[in-house]
């Protein structure tokens, strides 16, 4: 009997995992349709100052941003269970906060509701260290509602990173479902607080 592989390994999944999710999500959205003008950006130098994201934010002038990332899985031996937020097989991570960016609260709530409604497994995370391209993108222009969706990954900057393919698929599904739900009215509701 053939067993299905649920874990994969490879070099430097941060941020190759996010790029792969973006490609798969865009393929699906192009085939099945959506209400938006979508722009994909594969940026460079996130680890040394989000340089690519800074210029991308200026060039794209986005109304809303979904950052796709390969964040750390905290389920490795020796890591305190009380500090563990991301685990392989626990679903896509929805990041609420890190030292460089705070998720738009309405977009975070929409991501969580979208995942719940679609039965997509997810993990809410708050990181005490690190950051993503959301650091630059959420500050571009007049400010951009942003959310980080991540595929939890062990040993993210090593030659042998490990991820769970179920988390990967959950990230693709949530990215697609969230993009579909973000029509003009939904995007405007992310930043308009007064009647």
What are these regions (language model features)?
Residues 1-6:
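Short, small-residue-biased leader/transition segments that mark boundaries at the very start
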Residues 50-54, 76-80, 135-136, 159-161:
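Short, well-ordered secondary-structure micro-motifs
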Residues 7-13, 97, 162:
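A short glycine/serine-rich beta->alpha loop
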Residues 56-76:
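A glycine-rich helix N-cap at a beta->alpha junction
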């Amino acid at each position: 009997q053939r067993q299905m592989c649920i874990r994969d390994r490879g070099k430097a999944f941060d941020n190759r995992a996010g790029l792969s999710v973006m490609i798969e999500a865009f393929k699906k959205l192009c085939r099945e349709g959506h209400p938006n003008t979508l722009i994909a950006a594969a940026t460079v130098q996130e680890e040394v100052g989000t340089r690519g994201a800074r210029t991308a934010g200026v060039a794209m002038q986005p109304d809303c941003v979904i950052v796709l990332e390969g964040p750390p899985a905290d389920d490795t031996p020796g890591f305190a269970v009380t500090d563990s937020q991301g685990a392989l097989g626990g679903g896509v991570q929805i990041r609420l906060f890190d030292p460089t960016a705070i998720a738009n609260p309405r977009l975070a709530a929409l991501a969580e509701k979208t995942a719940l409604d679609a039965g997509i497994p997810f993990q809410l995370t708050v990181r005490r260290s690190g950051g993503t391209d959301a650091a630059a993108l959420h500050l571009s222009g007049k400010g951009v509602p942003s959310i980080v969706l991540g595929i939890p990954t062990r040993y993210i900057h090593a030659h042998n990173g490990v991820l769970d393919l179920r988390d990967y698929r959950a990230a693709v599904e949530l990215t697609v479902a969230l993009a579909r739900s973000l029509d003009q009215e939904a995007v405007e509701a992310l930043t308009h607080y007064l009647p």
